[in-house]
Amino acid sequence: MKFIIFNGSLKADSESNTFSVCKMTQLAFEKLGHTCEVVTMRELDYESATSDVNDDLKPHIMKMFDADGVVFATPIWWGTHSCHIQALLERLDFIYSWAKDNKYQPFYNKVLGTLVSGGGDGFQHIHGVLYSAASNFGFTIPPQCNIESKAQGIEEIKTDEDTVNQVKNCAINMTTWARILKEGNPTKDARHGSVDINEEAAGVGIVTKQNATKDVPVGGEYMNVKKLGLSK
């Protein structure tokens, strides 16, 4: 399977603790037999926007459609994630809008993890913000896929037991849940938008001529809800 790590560090790779943990995570995926690419965003010439822009970042965004999982990696800066990861969220906004307009969520069969490097407060807030955004984008968030590394410097990072264990948890759980999603293909039966062809199966919405069935006639939305044991 394929995984992408977006490194949102503000420092050069040679000086970045975040990049060091990214490389550890990349190695963990590779040891499990999967491919993993680390994209250092500060090295790209990209535009801050909420629209589809042709620049250095776009090809990496497009790779997300073929990937099985994505990791957002960031240091803690003033209690929150870096400007590069914020820019990535903003650049994904056009996909979010497209998904709503076309009633199809392209990231439903994909998993997401987060990686936060830093010794100060803020990691829980960062995980929460990124998970909220990822959920709205359609990603599935497996358990214990939130890496928090307080270690400083590559040598300390490599030998820090907490960092090593969290990296292992993240890589193993992301690949496990990605495989489950790949085999189960929830995209097929999941609800993709505010109006969806599967709504009659979910017991919501108004039954029309287009989605009526022999068991649920036109106007029979209340009966459909009762049949599923749901309250009106």
Summary of predicted features, one role per range:
Residues 103-147, 162-165:
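Short, glycine-/small-residue-rich phosphate/pyrophosphate-handling segment
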Residues 1-102, 157, 161-232:
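N-terminal beta1-alpha1-beta2 submodule of the flavodoxin-like/Rossmannoid cofactor-binding fold
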Residues 18, 51, 122, 127, ...:
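Surface-exposed beta-strand edges and their flanking turn/coil or helix-capping segments
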Residues 3-10, 23, 38, 42, ...:
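Ligand-binding pocket scaffold of soluble enzyme catalytic domains
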